[in-house]
């Protein structure tokens, strides 16, 4: 979405996307819960998971190992793949050096006691830095394909990666309540913005995949491939101008 705000685009495909209002810390209409975006950004990263990324951990002996996080967060329960080692190896290429993952945080007087800093991957999604709802006002609106699964643990109206939701269900103590720290309705926010995009003259195609988690392209590769090829004009109604045929390199398996 940010790319489409910064550059002309022929089409836009969103796969299990972050909300247009960032990750955590907003109400449904996108208003920020606190001035410092408490509870969002790098401070929410699990320190043991970060250390295991640094160590290149390939095991599954802990719920915070990259392999366990892949299974519990990135895909739906029961998903298996002969390529799992490759996906975990890819996770372990993440740089945990200062300035990359997860980033820095600062103390906050607001629950849960921290706010995003100024550097790092997770801070880029804090509401103070991330707001792509302006796509509604684009003069030239590329057609949008939105693909997401029904059991996404990461991007959800009840995300297990949203500290406010974790507070509400008792995982994190001291939660100040729904009025102060509600869970972010991520999918509903995306739908609201895309509905407004459609009402303003844009085209939006939504593909909802049952029993699919955060990785539709891995979990339902054939369905994802077909939806993408339809969106960019290779099958069905041709796009104008047509995309280059040399771009077709997508197999229908993972």
Residue ranges, per PLM feature:
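Conserved hydrolase catalytic core segment
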Residues: 1-31
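Surface-exposed intrinsically disordered loops and tails
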Residues: 13-15, 35-41, 203
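Alpha/beta-hydrolase
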Residues: 30-189
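Short catalytic/ligand-binding loop motif for oxyanion handling, primarily in non-cytosolic enzymes
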Residues: 21-24, 78, 153-156, 214-217
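A short helix->loop->beta-strand "cap" motif at the edges of active sites that frequently abuts
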Residues: 9-10, 141-142, 201-202
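Hydrophobic/aromatic beta-strand patches that form the interior of the parallel beta-sheet core
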Residues: 13, 145-147, 207
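Catalytic active-site module of serine/aspartate enzymes centered on a nucleophile-bearing elbow/loop
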Residues: 162, 170-254
